Amino acid sequence: MYDVIVAGAGHAGTEAALAVSRSGLSCLLVTTDLNAVARMSCNPAIGGVAKGQITREIDALGGEMAKAIDSTGIQFRMLNLSKGPAMHSPRAQADRVAYTAYMKRALEEEVNLDLLQDTVTGIEQREGILRGVRLLSGRLVTGRAAILTCGTFLNGLIHIGMDHYPGGRTIAEPPVTGLTENLILAGFEAGRLKTGTPPRIDRRSVDYSRVEEQKGDENPPPFSFSTPTLKGRAQLSCYVTHSSERTHEILKTGFDRSPLFTGKVQGIGPRYCPSIEDKIFRFPDRPGHHIFLEPEGFETNEMYVNGFSTSLPEDIQIDGLRSMKGLEEVKLIRAGYAIEYDYFPPYQIHSTLETKRIRNLYFAGQINGTSGYEEAAAQGLLAGINAAADILKRPALRLKRSDAYIGVLVDDLVTKEMKEPYRMFTSSAEHRLMLRHDNADIRLMHFGHQSGLVSDAAMERCRTKMRAIGEIKALTEKTAIPAEVLDSLISKQGQPHAASGQKISAAIKRPGMSLEILMNSLPPFREALLSISTDKEAHQQVEIDLKYEGYLKRELLTADKIARLDALQIPSEYNYSCIKGLSSEGVEKLISHRPETLGQASRISGVSPSDISVLMVHIGR
């Protein structure tokens, strides 16, 4: 018997298995192909808007994704630097093959982890408690808990034009059959979603004189808090071209053979990552769309055509690609395709990712209706932490919306109606100024340390940084900038004359002012600050905390109000039907979702503020 069995070794499964085994428990990771561990089946990249923040949070909690991309990245960029700090998001292109090799090596190094090449086709449970899993080989493996991270494999069906093939992630990988049906028999509700991927081309066939080069940053910050620097790393460029009206006309000639428009695809696709044919259909007035050409690694000629996700017939794909600048002679390596797959609407899970119907069974990743490697990895890590915590009799990790993007992700899953693949955006987080990529360690590392996934040394580095931030803030409070120095600085910004000096903590709030400018203008202040810490991340956080102090205080007040509702627990078998005053829709949604707290209940679609007022009175009794 294993403590925990993990089904699937994608981005969710690898993080789940590592979290369990590093907690000191025995774990079995079952996957159809051990050479496809953490495979990047779509874009060869980690991070991006909101996703970069999630990757940093995974690292702070003790996950592996950030270390993996630091080790195998081929281009690193910080996005949205022209916007405020809440929007700054790290992103990296990955060497796809090297990333898989890194993750497989990480799994193989874990002494508590066994790997098995097989397929989970069913679960065994007795009286609502998980007992084990059934494998395609016919074997029964018993376990105290199981985490299902099946990705797009559940009854996967791939579409290219009017042709369709059973496939789990690519045409070469078989789907998982039987598991969906097994779970439905156990009382779960399943649905159908769709996603897609662009074609891959031979980068030697691109005319680089006709496309725009996009280089990486010279000194990008690492994703992992344990990576000292990425300075001097070899990087590859990406390139930008555009679709044209001619491209769109060519692609339209294939719409009568498109599975999207002929009704062959039944699953609902991601709203914010539409196919090129969907973009043409939805935005007919747009003469063109950005297309990004992204290399897939140092040792391959494959290039990913970002922005050209499609399931049109292969001949139409080739003609469409060759109508764009720089791609006139392009060679196709792999056609783009759409894939339909089963998922389980996530109102059926708790915020710990344990299912409500079967104890000790957890769902993580695309089985919950999410899209994206980072969203999947975050869920896998959380499920692994909580499965281990339950066995070890530790408190479960429940992240609030004000704690982390991961908290927002899980709360949205368990409270909102899932009608399409869920993708995280900064706009999804009402506390996004608090949930920046740079402070993920301060927000979350203590949780990872309590779970046994973050070392004492890493936790001490975080505490040292926190102490330095506090001491530097105190220094800015007691150090004043003389009027003549301040006047000289602000006159360069075209600001009114300064009649008197100011504390540095106040002066830094002025437009165009920065900690670096103030340090360079006041040598004694610079010397005192550097004697506290030379950590540039600590300096950056001090500047952000001081500049946005008023906004951060408002976010904290909002978070406190929400926390009061989240502190009011609702019994799991609460009888909503007998409460007078609740709307009929409210009763229906409360019964199906079974919220854990009044705060969760308030965020369920269809539960009105008046319903919450009625509940508050009854629960308060």
Curated annotation (Swiss-Prot):
Its cofactor is FAD. InterPro entries: FAD/NAD-bd_sf, GIDA_C_N, MnmG, MnmG-rel, MnmG-rel_CS, MnmG_C, MnmG_C_subdom, MnmG_C_subdom_sf. SMART domains: GIDA_assoc_3. FAD binds at G8, A9, G10, H11, A12, G13. Keywords: Cytoplasm, FAD, Flavoprotein, NAD, tRNA processing. It is found in: Cytoplasm. GO terms for molecular function: flavin adenine dinucleotide binding. Residues 199-227 are annotated as: Disordered. This is tRNA uridine 5-carboxymethylaminomethyl modification enzyme MnmG. The gene is mnmG.
